């Protein structure tokens, strides 16, 4: 079974994302920040990360860089999600190693379809 991790410091946002993708029927982990996410991911590899950019302790950019540097996580897919919609924020996300970038508020149907496509599920 493929594993998904939702990384966001806001509990309500994690709950929203979990509700959107729960029908995909995958194991879903949660983390409040990049440090916690990395610790959990190194214990049980993650196939797909949904990562907020602005978080305490370790932001999404740094987390993405750490994921790309770890052999056991390097092939994971990363969707960066941010309230920032400026072109330079999106470019920085991709330079950090993100595969996809979405601006908040996230379109729930687009997120569900994207996650399904990434994991090879029909949605």
Where are the regions a protein language model picked out?
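Active-site beta3 strand of CheY-like receiver
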Residues: 44-50
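Two-component/phosphorelay signaling modules centered on CheY-like receiver
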Residues: 11-29, 118
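Short hydrophobic/Thr-rich beta-strand motif most characteristic of the beta2 strand and flanking loop
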Residues: 25-32, 40, 102
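Receiver (REC) domain active-site loop signature in two-component systems and cognate sites
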Residues: 55
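C-terminal output helix
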Residues: 106-115
